[in-house]
Amino acid sequence: MTIRGYGRVTPLQMDMLELGGEILSPGGSEPASDEERLSVMKEARQALTKQTGRDFGFDLAAWHQFLLNDAKLSEEYTFAYAWKAVKRRIDELLDDPDRRRLERLLNEHP
């Protein structure tokens, strides 16, 4: 899918951005309520768990490291079309206090 600001993202890239609380649409990321972000984060975790057979919860850093180092999945995760923009945004989300707040909420009230 092509997403403004990212380019042509792979399903894994999209799942990771959504795990970080991004609401994606072909027009680009949109401002969203906490409820919308929490919902998309839950859906992304389910999709990642289903595709990988692993579950790192809502820990974006753990998922990121796993996907970077998995021989089978890293190629899709780092696929060149959108990787530069996706990686930049994942790095920002890893340090984003608002995303960490949402992650804490999900961990406290699954």
Language model region names:
Residues M1-P110:
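Extended repeat-based scaffolds of very large eukaryotic assembly and lipid-transport proteins
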